[in-house]
């Protein structure tokens, strides 16, 4: 997808989000324009309990949102669609570029993004604390997720994302 098309789709996604959140309500639909999960329309439903592998809509915390916006990855206010990879009590490790959960290799991080810019790095093992989650789209090697920015507060989860229509259908 060209950068121009990506910008148009991201703007469309932000518009849908803005229109769906008027009055403080949880957004009901999100248009995903990234390749991290299939491109398409997703319905956001309440998630009372999260499970590993579940696809969720996440509103990045302020510092992460500013980083994503400043670097042109995602405008402020637009949620990300990510899979839950680890929940409280699970151990997540980054050893070099390898991400492992409870001793099982789940994927690789990259040193640089598609434009050649260095990506955030953390190393070592972390037990996911109560109130946190680790999100990673392991099926997409280029996904910008917890393999770079670490665990997120579970409160950042807007809800469960269910595909309504995607380009894979």
Q: What residue spans do the PLM features occupy?
A:
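Extended hydrophobic leader/signal-anchor segments used for secretion and membrane insertion
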Residues: 1-169
